[in-house]
């Protein structure tokens, strides 16, 4: 219960109040106090119920002589042959139309049956869009590139291999350990928010074999629900009546210094704006190899055939 320590009232002279009004004020005050106390004492929902400390390996303990493994992400079917000819160890497919995944998987296996092929999920997944996952399963890939927690939950018990992508934002040993264990992921892509020094710190604190590093790519700068293609290149209002201009037009946005940045749509009609200038971390390769990292990735955008090689 509660005990009133003091009370100060400032009322006009001659005012008469029934006792019921005072009781109402007392009850309202008690309810407000109880609400505040419950909010202060309630446990934080995101707090782990027990201490969770990932195991760590000292520098150089994670098989530094392991051969490097190179995976390549393709965004167009015609990129597949040159990527396989160049000697990729694994292929990730990230197509706008998920219905093309089955043909992409077939193309990889016809060209190089021993090369594993992974299919990328959308960055964002709404509850009504689990049909995308079923479509990916029917393509019969070797594995899935997990880009959101809904995909991690859906494929958690799948026999397919599961790789965590950059959008899971693995930036410290705790997030890496939780996602790898709870999501049953084979390995994780390091967050794009980390600089080279921070990547090195994470590799020293966590088993390097947990990770893959995107070494060369056009950095995704914005991912948005708004569809530029539908808004400016059609008279429609959604995928039902826009006529799919994203399948016919190549769109780039020009920034204030004249640089062109490619814009791509995904299966959910969400748009991603990519940096028109490729970013590479090749200069840090030897240092990361010395720290035990062996998995690296190259991501293609609309690269010409000569650059793909």
Positions of PLM-derived features:
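Active-site pocket-lining/capping segments in soluble small-molecule metabolic enzymes
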Residues: 1-307
